[in-house]
């Protein structure tokens, strides 16, 4: 019997964070990522990571094969048929790796999410990511990554559990477009770091819902204040519905610096 060309067994050796790292490396380096020396460095870095405690080490060959498969998928012409089922699903549940945080959201009725405002930056130690829900296109803190799958199109999806919600509200989300490092609440002493044109995560309060949505800064009315209280006003336009609103510092979070 001919050997299967399904390469999913190579992908299942990696954790989600390792795949995200390799996605970014491939985006920067392209086919240069196939070089043996580079793959050895990546494999050594992954194997020495604390996230690999209790897991087998990664070999440079596994890393190289991952990049080869990525390059192959990128080179293939787009098919006109519907995408095939996912290549694999891998269990990432690990209580020691992903710490749950106190509830920052509640579920109301059958379909309405209601979020509370984020805390201080010092509260972010255990929650590193946020994900965008397909239900309302709002961003929620991620409590844990449960499984992931690599589609035949090469896209990576992960199943997330949102902080403050149970497994009934778990979702598959696209890693590239709907998962990112958690936004950071802006302290009064940091308001000068927010500029016109910046992308912010904004707390949008409406009569029927309260959501965290992306918005761009259109204008800033800066006031004189001390490090303990900020009276600046930020005019933002929400990406969700293209409406504009003036917000105080307590209703905005900045994106981490790259």
UniProtKB/Swiss-Prot annotation:
Listed GO MF terms: chromatin binding; metal ion binding
Cellular component annotations (GO), alphabetically ordered: nucleus
Phenotypic consequence of residue 140 to A: Loss of interaction with H3K9 and DNA methylation defects
Subcellular location: Nucleus
Other facts noted in the record for this chain: Associates in vivo with Pol IV but not with Pol V and this interaction is not dependent on its H3K9me binding activity. Glu-130 and Asp-141 interact with the H3K4 side chain while the H3K9me1/2/3 side chains insert into a hydrophobic aromatic cage formed by Tyr-140, Phe-162 and Phe-165.
Domain-level remarks: The SAWADEE domain (138-244) binds to mono-, di-, or trimethylated H3K9 histone peptides, but this interaction is impaired if H3K4me2/3 methylation is present.
UniProt-recorded name of the protein: Protein SAWADEE HOMEODOMAIN HOMOLOG 1
Species per Swiss-Prot/TrEMBL record: Arabidopsis thaliana
Gene behind this protein: SHH1
């Amino acid at each position: 019997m001919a050997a299967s060309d399904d390469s999913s067994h190579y992908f299942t050796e990696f954790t989600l964070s390792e795949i995200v790292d390799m996605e970014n490396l491939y985006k920067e380096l392209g086919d240069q990522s196939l070089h043996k020396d580079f793959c050895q460095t990546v494999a050594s870095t992954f194997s020495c990571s604390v996230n690999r405690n209790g897991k087998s080490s990664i070999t440079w060959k596994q890393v190289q094969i991952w990049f080869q498969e990525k390059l192959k998928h990128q080179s293939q012409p787009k098919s006109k048929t519907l995408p095939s089922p996912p290549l694999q699903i891998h269990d990432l549940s690990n209580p020691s790796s992903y710490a749950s945080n106190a509830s920052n959201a509640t579920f109301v009725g059958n379909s309405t999410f209601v979020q509370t405002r984020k805390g201080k930056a010092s509260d972010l130690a255990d929650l590193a990511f946020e994900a965008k829900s397909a239900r309302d296109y709002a961003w929620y803190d991620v409590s844990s990554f449960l499984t992931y799958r690599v589609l035949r199109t090469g896209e990576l999806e992960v199943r997330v559990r949102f902080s403050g919600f149970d497994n009934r509200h778990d979702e598959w989300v696209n890693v590239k477009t709907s998962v990112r490092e958690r936004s950071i609440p802006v302290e009064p002493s940091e308001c000068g770091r927010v500029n016109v044109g910046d992308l912010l995560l904004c707390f949008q309060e409406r009569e029927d819902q309260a959501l965290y949505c992306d918005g761009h800064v259109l204008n800033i009315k800066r006031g004189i204040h001390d490090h303990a209280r900020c009276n600046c006003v930020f005019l933002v336009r929400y990406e969700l519905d293209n409406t504009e609103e003036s917000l105080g510092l307590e209703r905005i979070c900045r994106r981490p610096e790259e």
